[in-house]
Amino acid sequence: MRLSTSMIYQQNMQGIINGQATWQKTGEQLATGKRVVNPSDDPIAAANVIMLDQAQSENSQYTLARTFAKQSMSLEESILSKSTITITSALSEVIKSGGTINDDNRSSIAASLRGMKAELLNMANSTDGNGNYIFAGYETDKTPFVEGASGIEYQGGYQAISQQVDSSRSMTVSHIGSDVFMRATGGAKTEPDGSVQADLFESLDIAINALETPLDGADDATKESVAAAMNTANRGLNNSLSNISSARAELGIQLNEIDNLDAIGKDRDVANKTTLSQLQDTDWVEAISSYMMQMSSLQASYTTFQNMQGMSLFQMK
């Protein structure tokens, strides 16, 4: 088969152009550190990279969500821990008042309980660093506990704040105040009539009112009424302690779970990054070797082409 001068020229030029493209592509891989820069480089790998990028983005979002959840639960746990100490002190005062003490001592205990009530009310109305009420549910701009005509009333939201902390796990990260300070657990101590004294602030009010009732020279009916009230306050405070302990236990379990999910998330992050690297990152040894070989081959092609241009064949009309 006879080849025309133009065909030989075109074939050599095309070879050089293809060689340049391959060399430049390898250079791009070295410059970016990526083997797959465009989907056309490796369509299957590119599709897998997109899916893994999405998985990484989701994993990062859940990691951030767990950080916020942990902060919220840790703050609530801290407040409930302090509340437990105060309630325990109040219960101790109530028990102490059951002894043989005079009205002055009883009034002093009542004043102490008033101070503890104010302290607990302040804790129940705690805010986070952004001014959001912790125990108000989703109505974070509302003061959850206010002094009403009949005592402390709850006016916050009635839906606890939940957080999606993993693809298949959502948890309560902040309890509503009424569930914490005005409820009792299933095993609560009952009153003689079968009811349950569960409202923490009401229990304190019962004790305060009873302690402020003079007993020096009082009749038996009054003394019995005061004793019954103090027993009710005692049971109520015990119920509040149990209920808050239950909430704290739930928080503790969930905080441990958050730590476990964080560990899983870190493992997932490492696995995804490893797979992404295998799919798209440049193999430096192979790429550098290919780059040098392609450059040498291209230089040889240039030299050959230039030499051929000097031959008479290319000068023929």
Located regions from the model:
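Cysteine-poor, low-complexity segments in flexible/peripheral regions
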Residues: 139-222
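Amphipathic alpha-helical polymerization modules
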Residues: 1-140, 209-317
